[in-house]
């Protein structure tokens, strides 16, 4: 039996890719998402783990601030409750977290996530 659900999902994904303008347009959106995410996160005090010369547009790793006054679990829960997800870092020598830049993610999503993180920071500084 052929995996019809897989074939149908692939066909739909290819249709959506074509509607967006193909690989060049999708790649451009991912790169723009990445640049905007890094810019917004830097405004909030988060630095990237790797330099821009090696940063790819798929997922971005940020350093978790050493003296933030809150933990990753608190920040994760706050963001998750508001409909977004971030991921714990997998780097052993530094405290990090990751944010994906691909999929159904657009400028407005990046801006909303940045606002949620900003609100979280304000609430935790007010404690």
Residue ranges and their predicted role:
Residues 2, 29, 67, 105, ...:
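Catalytic cores of large soluble enzymes that bind and process phosphate-bearing ligands
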Residues 82-98:
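Conserved PLP cofactor-binding pocket of PLP-dependent enzymes
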Residues 4, 56, 80, 93-95:
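A generic structural signal for well-ordered coil/turn residues at beta-strand boundaries
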